[in-house]
Amino acid sequence: MTGKITTLLFDLDGTLINTNELIIKTFQVTFQEFMPDRVFTREDILPFIGPSLMETFREINPAHADEMRAFYREYNLKHHDDLILEYDGVYEAIRALYEEDYKLGIVSTKMYDTIMRGLKVTGLDKFFQVVIGLDQVSNAKPDPEGIEMALSLLNATKEEAIMIGDNYHDIEAGKNAETLTAGVAWAIKGPEHLAQFQPDFMLEKMSDLLAIVRDEE
């Protein structure tokens, strides 16, 4: 792919904001409520970060998947603002991209309202022109639907776009949409895990994006 990058699409959790402890704690409490006889360690829960809730709960406990999702969301929202953290340098890098007139969007497997809450808590909401949540698409990542919807709303093409994320769902979704892709080295599963999905770039820090988009010009 050649040409100028004008459009940057981001995953939210684990990419722009650190919700790892919130997610792990919420899963632990949910599993304790519905499956008290089974112990889920932190390592057991890591693979559940990234896929949609229903994908996870249907695999673990299909008979109670709907109830578990409702319980998870209630607990998650209640403790959301207390447990999310900012990643160093993210705000400054996103602000710089915004000020240089790049088109910025979010494509997440979270519900729209929850995405907006996280963005507002961290002050990032003012920088993103398009936000695509799970409740706005029929098919979650790695299906390209969310990316394609965001590109359409931003009046951008796949040739000028890059998808940035911390999970294989993000990289695969970008590849399926035929955009460039970037993994983040601060992913909770580690850069080695992401590297096996062969993103075009691996970011050591969010400001690395500035050099990437400028080099593409």
Swiss-Prot record:
Listed GO biological process terms: DNA repair
Domain of life: Bacteria
UniProt cofactor(s): Mg(2+)
GO terms of molecular function: inorganic diphosphate phosphatase activity; magnesium ion binding; phosphoglycolate phosphatase activity
Catalytic residues as annotated in Swiss-Prot or TrEMBL: 11 (nucleophile)
Catalytic function, reaction form: diphosphate + H2O = 2 phosphate + H(+)
Keyword vocabulary terms for this entry: Hydrolase, Magnesium
EC class of the enzyme, as a word: hydrolase
EC number: 3.6.1.1
Transmembrane segments: none
GO cellular component labels: cytosol
InterPro entries hit by this protein: HAD-like_hydrolase_sf (IPR050155), HAD-like_sf (IPR036412), HAD-SF_hydro_IA (IPR006439), HAD_2 (IPR041492), HAD_sf (IPR023214), PGP-like_dom2 (IPR023198), Pyrophosphatase_Ppax (IPR023733)
Keyword Magnesium belongs to the record: yes
Pfam family, one: HAD_2
HAMAP family named among the record's database cross-references: Pyrophosphat_PpaX
PANTHER family attached to this UniProt entry: PHOSPHOGLYCOLATE PHOSPHATASE (PTHR43434), PYROPHOSPHATASE PPAX (PTHR43434:SF26)
Protein task: Hydrolyzes pyrophosphate formed during P-Ser-HPr dephosphorylation by HPrK/P. Might play a role in controlling the intracellular pyrophosphate pool.
Family: Belongs to the HAD-like hydrolase superfamily. PpaX family.
Protein name, per record: Pyrophosphatase PpaX
Organism in which the protein naturally occurs: Listeria monocytogenes serotype 4b (strain CLIP80459)
